[in-house]
Amino acid sequence: VDLTAEEKAAVLALWGKVNEDEVGGEALGRLLVVYPWTQRFFDSFGDLSTPAAVLGNAKVKAHGKKVLHSFGDGVHNLDNLKGTYAALSELHCDKLHVDPENFRLLGNVLVVVLAQHFGQEFTPELQAAYQKVVAGVANALAHKYH
């Protein structure tokens, strides 16, 4: 990811304040509501029939937590995203057959959730840096597909 030293510092500083457990569930839940076709990858999660059901679903929250912890690994390894996500890229490509576009969608949803949580602190400059990070993570996760 092509970030300046200042952008890296800002990304890491904000990430230190992120409640990964809470934000992960919100981000995955929002993805499943805003882009309902992504629900097909989560058949085992039970009731996803309404936004309230999705957002209140314990399995969505638990998997969102797992996803965000993994994203945090990337935030702390910005210079080696492909290496950080090599195994997950292979899993999502070969076994789960997830459309890599979904990684981009989730990244964009995560930026929205961060903006909600941090309000004025999530400046346009910080958003721009996070957009670079989520794009880098999405590209790393899609690496096996190429």
UniProtKB/Swiss-Prot annotation:
Belongs to the globin family. Residues 2-146 form the Globin domain. It holds the Pfam family Globin. CDD domains: Hb-beta-like. PANTHER family: HEMOGLOBIN FAMILY MEMBER, HEMOGLOBIN SUBUNIT BETA. The keyword Zinc does not apply. The modification S-nitrosocysteine is found at residue 93. The modification N6-acetyllysine is found at residues 59, 82, 144. Keywords: Acetylation, Heme, Iron, Metal-binding, Oxygen transport, Phosphoprotein, S-nitrosylation, Transport. Red blood cells. The modification Phosphoserine is found at residue 44. The modification N-acetylvaline is found at residue 1. InterPro entries: Globin, Globin-like_sf, Globin/Proto, Hemoglobin_b, Hemoglobin_oxygen_transport. PROSITE patterns: GLOBIN (PS01033). This is Hemoglobin subunit beta. GO terms for molecular function: haptoglobin binding; heme binding; hemoglobin alpha binding; metal ion binding; organic acid binding; oxygen binding; oxygen carrier activity; peroxidase activity. GO terms for cellular component: blood microparticle; haptoglobin-hemoglobin complex; hemoglobin complex.
